[in-house]
């Protein structure tokens, strides 16, 4: 329901103009995804879709237009399945793995596998999409480190 409320507010506030931005840690329906895309937003996917039971998210990541997808870690929150420990495991002393930006390539590999495409092509598309969604990002990156590294 919160996605629908945000979409309604964006439609009202936008007055018909497209938005630039990313629906962070998107976990909505196919209809909500399309509504975000129609408003000009990109959809952020991260660790949540690495769980095999996340069927809807995995289907969206596989089927949505590549131009709508941005990869994200949401570190330290929303760890991928390989870092997650259950409440029972934690009560027995097993530590929760720490989600860090270094997990992004492995998360992206899951999405690339779902889409049946090379990891590098997904990484480039995600970078391009992030730069479209956040137009000032390119100039900020250039000012901070001389360009995009690792894309």
What annotation goes with each model-predicted range?
Residues 1-71, 79-82, 132, 142-150:
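Catalytic pocket-lining loop regions of alpha/beta-barrel enzymes
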Residues 49, 74, 125:
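Residue-level "edge-of-site" marker
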Residues 62-63, 86-87, 137-138:
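Alpha-helix boundary/capping detector
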Residues 98-151:
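Mid-to-C-terminal alpha-helical segments outside catalytic/metal-binding sites
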Residues 1, 27, 52-55, 91, ...:
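Residues at secondary-structure transition points
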Residues 16-18, 92-94, 137:
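A short, structure-level motif marking secondary-structure boundaries and short turns
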């Amino acid at each position: 329901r919160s996605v629908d409320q945000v979409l309604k507010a964006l439609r009202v506030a936008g007055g018909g103009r497209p938005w630039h931005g990313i629906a962070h840690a998107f976990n909505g329906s196919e209809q909500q995804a399309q509504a975000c895309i129609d408003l000009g937003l990109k959809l952020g996917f991260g660790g949540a879709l690495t769980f095999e039971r996340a069927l809807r998210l995995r289907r969206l990541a596989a089927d949505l237009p590549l131009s709508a997808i941005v990869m994200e870690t949401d570190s330290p929150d929303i760890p991928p399945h390989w870092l997650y420990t259950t409440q029972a495991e934690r009560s027995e002393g097993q530590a929760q793995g720490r989600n860090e930006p270094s997990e992004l390539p492995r998360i992206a590999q899951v999405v690339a596998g779902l889409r049946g495409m090379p990891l590098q092509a997904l990484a480039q598309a995600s970078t391009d999409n992030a730069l479209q969604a956040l137009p000032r990002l390119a100039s900020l990156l250039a000012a901070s480190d001389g360009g995009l590294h690792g894309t």
